[in-house]
């Protein structure tokens, strides 16, 4: 199934992405400072060793940091429906890959040193409003929303601004600011990222 990413407008397929990452087939789309580090090298990094990551976990992280994030998140959100139905009807919801990616993030989050109070940012694209309920405080003093997919964030405010829709002058451009805590802080996946300049936290 061929698809085009919303961020860097890369047209690719899951098979091609697998070949670039696992089989070391040369990738023609190396713009935006994309890098493809061999999986064998990533497995030797200190963070991989400390978190006891398996080869398939490293592969899943690297795939997510490239164009495949769009497929995995579409499946988890079941949206957009027309895109989701392609994978559902094809009986391939990437269940194993998503399970392995969750495992990798959980392992990394235990060994990733993110100082308390670190601010992370997420650009929201500028195409939609947050619902009113997002801002309403419930009886327990909480507000917000549940994200069904992986929530990519960055420690670099300027990267988030690039994803916010502000450059395109979209009317609803915004950046979400998230303060990390000791309870649920995710993982720094920048060392594995195909786009290291994004300083990605998942």
Where are the predicted features?
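Mono-ADP-ribosyltransferase
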Residues: 1-202
């Amino acid at each position: 199934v061929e698809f085009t990413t919303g961020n860097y407008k890369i047209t690719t397929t899951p098979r091609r992405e697998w070949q670039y990452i696992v089989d070391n087939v040369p990738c023609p789309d190396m713009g935006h400072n994309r890098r493809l580090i061999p999986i064998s090298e990533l497995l030797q990094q200190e963070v991989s060793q400390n978190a006891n990551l398996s080869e398939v976990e490293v592969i899943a992280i690297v795939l997510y940091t490239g164009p495949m994030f769009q497929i995995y998140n579409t499946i988890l959100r079941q949206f957009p429906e027309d895109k989701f139905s392609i994978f559902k009807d094809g009986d391939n919801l990437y269940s194993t890959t998503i399970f392995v990616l969750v495992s990798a993030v959980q392992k990394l989050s235990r060994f990733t040193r993110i100082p308390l109070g670190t601010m992370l940012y997420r650009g929201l694209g500028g195409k939609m409003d947050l619902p009113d309920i997002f801002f309403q405080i419930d009886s327990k003093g909480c507000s917000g929303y549940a994200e069904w997919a992986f929530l990519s964030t960055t420690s670099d405010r300027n990267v988030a601004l690039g994803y916010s829709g502000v450059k395109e002058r979209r009317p609803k451009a915004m950046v979400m600011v998230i303060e990390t805590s000791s309870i649920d802080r995710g993982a720094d996946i920048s060392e594995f990222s195909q786009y290291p300049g994004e300083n990605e936290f998942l």
